[in-house]
Amino acid sequence: MSGRGKGGKAKGKSKTRSSRAGLQFPVGRIHRLLRKGNYAERVGAGAPVYLAAVMEYLAAEVLELAGNAARDNKKTRIIPRHLQLAIRNDEELNKLLSGVTIAQGGVLPNIQAVLLPKKTTKAK
């Protein structure tokens, strides 16, 4: 038991940690950035996988809502305005990104109720 293997299996094609976790976001790159970023002295193996999964979920959520906003405006390309509308119309995303300014995003259309014309009832 000297630690040397007896022949063993030949190394197959390497699989990325992203593909092992079933993610699109790069787990290896996120791990490297966590180590280089002076966030902690050591970074566990599961931390970058979890962070990549969370980031991928948030990106997918924002993109889906922005795609819906683009489709509502009869457009096929998502622009910053669609991102703004998607985020500000979603309660949870708006709370998460309340301190974020989106360049070229504009504002939500909003008219105060007191400024709207009064509804008159017709007497019969």
From Swiss-Prot:
<dbReference type="InterPro" id="IPR007125">
    <property type="entry name" value="Histone_H2A/H2B/H3"/>
</dbReference>
<keyword id="KW-0007">Acetylation</keyword>
<dbReference type="InterPro" id="IPR032458">
    <property type="entry name" value="Histone_H2A_CS"/>
</dbReference>
<dbReference type="GO" id="GO:0000786">
    <property type="term" value="C:nucleosome"/>
</dbReference>
<dbReference type="Pfam" id="PF16211">
    <property type="entry name" value="Histone_H2A_C"/>
</dbReference>
<feature type="modified residue" description="N-acetylserine">
    <location>
        <position position="2"/>
    </location>
</feature>
<keyword id="KW-0488">Methylation</keyword>
<keyword id="KW-0544">Nucleosome core</keyword>
<comment type="similarity">
    <text>Belongs to the histone H2A family.</text>
</comment>
<keyword id="KW-0597">Phosphoprotein</keyword>
<dbReference type="GO" id="GO:0003677">
    <property type="term" value="F:DNA binding"/>
</dbReference>
<comment type="function">
    <text>Core component of nucleosome. Nucleosomes wrap and compact DNA into chromatin, limiting DNA accessibility to the cellular machineries which require DNA as a template. Histones thereby play a central role in transcription regulation, DNA repair, DNA replication and chromosomal stability. DNA accessibility is regulated via a complex set of post-translational modifications of histones, also called histone code, and nucleosome remodeling.</text>
</comment>
<feature type="region of interest" description="Disordered">
    <location>
        <begin position="1"/>
        <end position="23"/>
    </location>
</feature>
<dbReference type="InterPro" id="IPR002119">
    <property type="entry name" value="Histone_H2A"/>
</dbReference>
<protein>
    <recommendedName>
        <fullName>Histone H2A</fullName>
    </recommendedName>
</protein>
<keyword id="KW-0238">DNA-binding</keyword>
<keyword id="KW-0539">Nucleus</keyword>
<keyword id="KW-0158">Chromosome</keyword>
<dbReference type="GO" id="GO:0030527">
    <property type="term" value="F:structural constituent of chromatin"/>
</dbReference>
<dbReference type="Pfam" id="PF00125">
    <property type="entry name" value="Histone"/>
</dbReference>
<dbReference type="InterPro" id="IPR032454">
    <property type="entry name" value="Histone_H2A_C"/>
</dbReference>
<comment type="subunit">
    <text>The nucleosome is a histone octamer containing two molecules each of H2A, H2B, H3 and H4 assembled in one H3-H4 heterotetramer and two H2A-H2B heterodimers. The octamer wraps approximately 147 bp of DNA.</text>
</comment>
<feature type="modified residue" description="N5-methylglutamine">
    <location>
        <position position="104"/>
    </location>
</feature>
<dbReference type="GO" id="GO:0046982">
    <property type="term" value="F:protein heterodimerization activity"/>
</dbReference>
<dbReference type="InterPro" id="IPR009072">
    <property type="entry name" value="Histone-fold"/>
</dbReference>
<feature type="compositionally biased region" description="Basic residues">
    <location>
        <begin position="1"/>
        <end position="18"/>
    </location>
</feature>
<dbReference type="GO" id="GO:0005634">
    <property type="term" value="C:nucleus"/>
</dbReference>
<feature type="modified residue" description="Phosphoserine">
    <location>
        <position position="2"/>
    </location>
</feature>
